[in-house]
Amino acid sequence: MNATNTAARKATWAVPAVLILLSLLFRLPSLVEGGGFGRLVSPSLDAALLALAVCLYTWAGLPGFTVVGAVLALLGVTVLSFQAADALIPLFFNRPFELFTDITYLPDLYALLRDTMSGWMFYAGLILLVAGLGGLGVGLYAGFRHLRRGFQDRTVRYGFLILLAVLVVLDLTTQVRFTANTAVPRMAEEAGKIAKKEQFVQEQQEAFSRQVQDSSRVMRPLEGLEGADVYLFIVESYGYTLYSEPMHFSLIEPELRQFQNRLTREGFRIASTFLDSPAFGGNSWLSDSTLATGVRIDNEAAYDLLHESDVKPIAQFFNEIGYRTVVAMPATTYAWPEGEFYRFEQKYYYKDFDYEGPNLKWAPMTDQYVVDFIHRNEVQGASQPLFIQYVMISSHYPFNMIPRFFEDWSQIGDGSIYHREDSVNVLPIKPGNQTAGAEGFVAAMAYELKLIREYLSNFVEGEALIIVVGDHQPYSGITGKNKPRSVPLHVISRRSDFVTPFVDRGYSEGLIPRQELPHAGLETFLPSLLESFSSVELASDPRSAAVKAGRATN
């Protein structure tokens, strides 16, 4: 009898301990959002609801608990995973978590980590993740069993229900926000978006139809270029912060001045602006496809729909007027059949570069090697005007492996020179940090800008039009929280009249953009390019507004 009483007392005292641990567990994601200790210790409604389910099941006297406990544990893991994503996505990508679209990134994330991490590290991390989620589920199940034993005591059940009632009353009459400490409304919101999938698809297809209609009005596209070569450099992580944050700007300003002064002396005219990218901190393909099509592609679902549409990408306009269209994408290390949509005549992916140098983790090869390879294989001896798009990668997160720039381009060869110890500057990542910080970020940007400057100065002859644009801001650990998505865009040419249409549109003279927030969308660039050099004027601004309006309803 005494043993029975002792067990009952232990079960009774276990209830408050389990409730406190559950509440702390479900409030852990709040630390990411800020608010400190106060938010952590505020009671969790999610934990209370799960405990209430155990209480009511026990009170009803229903037999068994194994299946119910497992279901509640699975539900708890699901809620915690949702809370973690809801806290971390805004931190890294400066946008809300969207279950409908973000869950589709998981296969790409898996492939990216598999390709960029060493084998043992990747599989060890995968095992730890599975073990962690499994351990979390087992821990929750054990906690719920403790609650069930404790709730068999009527006094404990009543005490728990009274506690819930007190918390609800305090929520209604004071500033204690018990009912706000839950993921339920956000989960319901995301479930509602999934239910509206058909509406989203219809709105996106309407946006694509507008682009197709506009494209059909361009009978002689880009004839104003008069056969001049066009080079498009899309620079990884080249964002607004480089110009707007005083610390970043002070570090990069010498390179910016050198870039402008060098090219101006050699007869180039430069105009610059900021445009609002659909991506932040990653997801470069969204900004690349937005730039290529003139339709804002701001999530994976829209990206997939785009590839099934009749939208005409930028390369096709050049194809139609006799250009050879080339894209260089060294970071594309696996089969990418969707690339056919973009209509490039010649595509260079990782396997096509004959690179014999080291893999620099996130950057499989250096951008100077890529530019040199394309110049030797495409630019030299070209018999057609060229449209070449470079998707640059050396400035990728975590900004800690900065290639050496070789003044003598003939040294680059097959890339094996990068095996030399002095060919890559490896910056330290301090314990607890994810990147090489502002120093690494600015060093990566300086490398890319110097590479473009030196290539234009030494190898681009004649009347070419050069476009340099960022794909997205670096992640929020570099920019800070709640920063704009804007990226710089520069148009450069020795033909002043190629730059004039952009200045007339509000671009700033020179390399440093001056436009105030808010900025026009990245999707406006292709229409403006077509308007500037084609004989038919497009309704670019209304279309852009319509696309944004459609997006706002999602």
Task: List each model region and its residues.
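Short N-terminal signal/transit or membrane-insertion segments
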Residues: 8-19, 156-178, 198-207, 220-224, ...
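Generic secondary-structure transition motif, activating predominantly at the C-termini of alpha-helices
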Residues: 85, 105, 110-117, 148-151, ...
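A diffuse structural propensity rather than consistent per-protein peaks
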Residues: 96-102, 193, 284, 349, ...
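Membrane-interface segments at or immediately adjacent to transmembrane helices
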Residues: 106, 164-237, 243-246, 254
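Solvent-exposed soluble domains appended to multi-pass membrane proteins
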Residues: 213-228, 232-235, 240-554
